[in-house]
Amino acid sequence: MAAKDVKFGNDARIKMLEGVNVLADAVKVTLGPKGRNVVLDKSFGAPTITKDGVSVAREIELEDKFQNMGAQMVKEVASQANDAAGDGTTTATVLAQSIIAEGLKAVAAGMNPMDLKRGIDKAVIAAVAALKELSVPCEDTKAIAQVGTISANADATVGNLIAEAMEKVGRDGVITVEEGQALHDELDVVEGMQFDRGYLSPYFINNQEAGSIDLESPFILLVDKKVSNIRELLPALEGVAKASRPLLIIAEDVEGEALATLVVNNMRGIVKVAAVKAPGFGDRRKSMLQDIAVLTAGTVISEEIGLELEKVQLEDLGQAKRITITKENTTIIDGAGEETMIQGRVAQIRQQIEDATSDYDKEKLQERVAKLAGGVAVIKVGAATEVEMKEKKDRVQDALHATRAAVEEGVVAGGGVALIRAASKVAASGLEGDNEEQNVGIRVALRAMESPLRQIVKNAGDEDSVVANNVRAGEGNYGYNAATGVYGDMIAMGILDPTKVTRSALQFAASVAGLMITTEAMITDMPAKDASAMPDMGGMGGMGGMGGMM
């Protein structure tokens, strides 16, 4: 086992704080409307330019192992804030740095670290309750656009695009961000349910120009198995032919004789039909077939529940207003399912989201909710260069997460004002700890809650102490707009922060800061010594006589 280097007490804490400061100082320059960019070197390709706090934090790795431990712990704050709310990473880092610096000063002065931590925790619990009281619901499109604009670093076009996307696909709709081909941003909305399976044969195509299959008011046959025998499909085909309406077959697969016969019937015009594979795999495929059944008021034909394909009636088939099938995708528009059934299914999937443990499962379940509840919107980010594209895409994704958080828990005044108001409320309530050291912990946390406002003002090139005093003297949403240098009502000026983002930033910062304040020893591997130099080759001197070989 390698030898270890151990540091105790103040020696350990000083090294740790040095690491925290390196990371936090690099991250906090990005905060606010006048935050600066950070350039990240990449091992290949062009450097990345970003104003995203968590992207900067993830790049930092320090040579000194003790400093690096401090930096990595604060990196965890940024990552957790990003995972929980999708934004607020820089705010969380600034808060953590402030709590750690003030807390370690108190520890160096001889205070009990455990009591300091308890005081900090008490202050944070009270501040979170105060933030919830200050929060107002974010319901209208204008407020959503404002949140998106602030999170995208005052880019109003991004805020408006996100608000428009949410309006079209609903609060639960899936909104994805992709790299576009144009110079400007675009919004592409897919109404209805879309899944990533295309036609099984190009001979089904009836819209030659678009290379797609368009079915008007079709029946939909949902089958949870492979279909290779045409006899199994005859009852369904005969029923549909009598009704003179098209048919879409969604099955695990349609192959061989069955597919060939469907193609021939379609080309001869006997029955208008198309076939696609069911989306997903295994249990997820069964669930998605059931989703389509609920959406279209159909029944999944499955031998597991005793339904046979040969005995299908027209009543078992789903229906929709229109279906479009391309080489890659199938879109079902305006299914015939009852709204109450669809909402029941959505509620059931939401419950599964709460119970799910893996992020991948949650994401897939969220997609299913969106497909049932509204639709899918794609924001295509436009830019002149690849470097700008990456930077802008990061900002749009941040803004999207922030707007979702705002819809979920409401909004508070932005620009660091909400934290100052929450701190004032806690101070006014006369919150006290069990002893003086806990009171110091409470004061450390409340003082740290001013740090995001101070950093925003510093980045704008103004005097932070003057602005902080002026904001503290005001009431309600009164704050400082760093972009214009004007004081006023932050919400009226459209400067909003999602409550969830502010709350998460404070909770995660206090959590990690509390752990670091109570650290008394740090252990790391000793640096490896260089391998000993190669032994000299003096014993080979006798080879000098080989000169005659030339």
From Swiss-Prot:
GO biological-process terms attached to the record: protein refolding
Alphabetized CDD domains for the sequence: GroEL
GO molecular function: ATP binding; ATP-dependent protein folding chaperone; isomerase activity; unfolded protein binding
Reactions this protein catalyses: ATP + H2O + a folded polypeptide = ADP + phosphate + an unfolded polypeptide
InterPro entries in alphabetical order: Chaperonin_Cpn60_CS (IPR018370), Cpn60/GroEL (IPR001844), Cpn60/GroEL/TCP-1 (IPR002423), GroEL-like_apical_dom_sf (IPR027409), GROEL-like_equatorial_sf (IPR027413), TCP-1-like_intermed_sf (IPR027410)
Enzyme Commission numbers on file: 5.6.1.7
GO cellular component terms attached to this protein's record: cytoplasm
Intrachain disulfide bonds: none
Location of this chain's protein in the cell: Cytoplasm
Keywords linked to the UniProt accession: ATP-binding, Chaperone, Cytoplasm, Isomerase, Nucleotide-binding
Main location: cytoplasm
Binding sites annotated in the UniProt record for ATP: 30-33, 51, 87-91, 415, 481-483, 497
Keyword GTP-binding: no
Keyword Chaperone annotated: yes
Family statement: Belongs to the chaperonin (HSP60) family.
NCBIfam families, alphabetized: GroEL, PRK00013.1, PRK12849.1, PRK12850.1, PRK12851.1
Subunit structure comment from the entry: Forms a cylinder of 14 subunits composed of two heptameric rings stacked back-to-back. Interacts with the co-chaperonin GroES.
Function: Together with its co-chaperonin GroES, plays an essential role in assisting protein folding. The GroEL-GroES system forms a nano-cage that allows encapsulation of the non-native substrate proteins and provides a physical environment optimized to promote and accelerate protein folding.
PANTHER family, sorted: 60 KDA HEAT SHOCK PROTEIN, MITOCHONDRIAL
Name of the protein in its database record: Chaperonin GroEL
Source organism of this protein record: Photobacterium profundum (strain SS9)
Name of the encoding gene: groEL
